[in-house]
UniProtKB/Swiss-Prot annotation:
Originating organism: Campylobacter jejuni subsp. doylei (strain ATCC BAA-1458 / RM4099 / 269.97)
Protein name: Ribosomal protein L11 methyltransferase
A Gene Ontology cellular-component term: cytoplasm
CDD domains for this protein: AdoMet_MTases
Residues spanning the signal sequence: none
Enzyme Commission no: 2.1.1.-
Described function: Methylates ribosomal protein L11.
Keyword Amino-acid biosynthesis in annotation: no
């Protein structure tokens, strides 16, 4: 074991966190931990170039989303004495129970009499601990039915798609990050389910209509995809929107007011909405 390793820490606004995680994974970084309201990246190799790249990436996101404030802060890089931080990382991840769905890692035991979802959090995009994921898991247990054609839009690690498949849905997944697709497919294999279709890209590449769509993505992207999402809803389809900070909830509701809002949930500052495709102009 090498005597030294490098640790990079930064804090990023919650709604952009997955973008930074995906960026780091794309660069081949695997040892990532979310802790202390921020993100730790550790490596035996120097992380100076990654630190610089993260700052450039943050600047580009600020320009893309027309923001007037920094979305990344407290960026620091230190050299530390080595320890088995992979084992430390494993100790810090706890399983999640949401009603009858039990989400756990590959090194944790299953729970009897529950729908067990096994996730390898090292692959990409988390292990289901986020508030918005919690809301989606709760809603999917209510609205997932056998034989429904379903889409996990922005699938990340594939948790939501796997849950829908466990309930008998014919699931398709998509994400703009190819690593997320690979992660979802591997996690599906771990859980003994298959996705009917998976592609790198967004809903504009989807074919046909869906009975159930779940989009656990940031509000800005939901607003951009609003028309495409609606155009792929079957009559009476269910649409679950999540990953929405409460300060954006009014904008989301205004954009989707032609659909019937049938349920909603807020955990801390994170909002989730469930719509039914009973359009008012029908």
């Amino acid at each position: 074991m090498q005597k030294k390793y490098y640790e990079l820490f930064f804090i990023v606004e919650e709604q952009y966190k997955n973008l930074f995680l995906g960026f780091a994974f794309d660069l081949g970084i695997e040892a990532i931990e979310e802790k202390d309201n921020g993100i730790y990246i550790r490596s035996h190799e120097s992380l100076e170039e990654l630190s610089w790249a993260l700052e450039i990436f943050a600047q580009k996101l600020t320009t893309t989303f027309n923001l007037n404030h920094k979305i990344i802060s407290n960026l620091s890089l230190v050299e530390k004495e080595n320890k088995d931080w992979i084992q430390e990382y494993k100790k810090g991840i706890k399983p999640i129970l949401v009603d009858n769905v039990y989400i756990h890692t590959t090194w944790q035991e299953e729970k009897k009499n529950c729908i067990n979802i096994k996730i390898n959090p090292a692959l990409a995009f988390g292990s289901g601990h986020h508030e918005s994921t919690h809301s989606c898991v709760k809603f999917l247990q209510k609205f997932s039915k056998s034989k429904l054609r379903a889409l996990d839009l922005g699938c990340g690690s594939g948790i939501l798609g796997i849950i829908m498949a466990k309930f008998g849905c014919n699931v398709e997944i998509c994400d703009t990050d190819e690593l997320a697709i690979d992660s979802s497919l591997e996690n599906a294999r771990l859980n003994g389910v298959d996705f009917h279709k998976a592609w790198c890209g967004s809903i504009d590449k989807a074919n046909g209509l869906y009975n159930l769509i779940v989009a656990n993505i940031i509000a800005d992207v939901i607003l951009i995809l609003e028309k495409d999402i609606k155009n792929h809803l079957e009559d009476n389809a269910i649409l679950i929107l999540s990953g929405i900070l409460d300060k954006y909830s009014t904008r989301i509701k205004e954009k989707f007011q032609d659909l019937e809002l049938i349920d909603e949930m807020q955990i801390n500052e994170w909002c989730s909405f469930v719509y039914k495709n009973n359009k008012k102009d029908k």
